[in-house]
C-alpha cells in the first residue's frame, strides 16, 4: 500500500464554522490554525497548502482568561521615533474583536509564505451572522 501525497490540484477544501461565544480565545484560535493548516485531515501533507476555510462567529463574545483584558496590549510601531502605539486588549475587544481574533490565529500559524495564504482563508465575524451561507459550511463540534 502506497502513501498518497496531496498536490495543489487534488486538494478539496471544506468550509467550517467555529463559534467563539464563551470559549477561550486561545483555544478557538489554536483550533482555527489547525484547520487552516490542514493538520486535522487524514491526508495532511506538510509541504502542500491543504487546509480548509474557517469562519469564526461571535468573536466579540470570546473570553480572555486571567487578567489579560487589563494587562495585555496590542502594540504597533510606525517606524518613526516615538511612533509606538499601544492599545489595551479590553478596548481592542470592544472596538475590533475581529482584529484581536485574527492576531491570535496569526500567532499560531507558521511564520512563512504558506501561512499568508492560509490566513486569507480565515473569515471572522463579531456577531452570529455570516455572509457565507452559499458555501454550505459545516459546524465544527468535535
Pin down the residues of each PLM region.
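Ribosome large-subunit tunnel/peptidyl-transferase-proximal elements
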Residues: 1-103, 109-113, 131-142
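Internal, active-site/partner-interface "lid" segment
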Residues: 117-134
Amino acid at each position: 500500500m502506497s502513501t498518497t501525497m496531496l498536490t495543489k490540484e487534488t486538494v478539496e477544501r471544506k468550509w467550517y464554522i467555529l463559534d467563539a461565544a464563551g470559549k477561550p480565545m486561545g483555544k478557538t484560535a489554536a483550533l482555527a490554525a489547525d484547520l487552516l493548516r490542514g493538520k486535522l485531515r487524514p491526508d495532511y501533507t506538510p509541504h502542500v497548502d491543504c487546509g480548509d476555510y474557517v469562519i469564526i462567529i461571535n468573536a466579540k463574545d470570546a473570553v480572555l482568561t486571567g487578567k489579560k483584558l487589563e494587562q495585555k496590549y496590542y502594540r504597533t510601531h510606525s517606524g518613526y521615533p516615538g511612533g509606538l502605539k499601544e492599545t489595551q486588549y479590553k478596548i481592542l475587544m470592544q472596538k475590533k474583536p475581529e482584529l484581536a481574533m485574527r492576531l491570535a490565529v496569526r500567532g499560531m500559524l507558521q511564520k512563512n509564505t504558506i501561512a499568508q495564504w492560509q490566513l486569507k482563508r480565515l473569515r471572522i465575524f463579531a456577531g452570529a451572522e455570516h455572509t457565507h451561507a452559499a458555501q454550505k459550511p459545516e459546524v465544527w463540534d468535535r
